[in-house]
Amino acid sequence: MSEPPRFEWHGPKAAANRAEHKVTFEEAATVFGDPLGRIAGDPRHSEGEQRYVLLGQSNRRRLLVVMFTERGEAIHLISARKATRREEREYEEGEA
């Protein structure tokens, strides 16, 4: 049995994300538990490190887009926001 992922983030960035997008990083971390979640690479924002985008449902039943990178054994959250209507359709149709 594998250990659950460990999450990390910068406090000021988490506060700014909450103010701008009304999504806490604590909620964003729960999206990683969505079995229907979709992860894609984010080459446009991957200068210096590989970044990824996760589209999935949180424990509050909100569909979120979470940007993250892997740092050692941890998942480093960069930002999180509510999915757009287009992203909602992609998720529902299994295209993300």
Locate the predicted segments by residue.
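Ribonuclease/tRNase effector modules and their secretory precursors
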Residues: 1-96
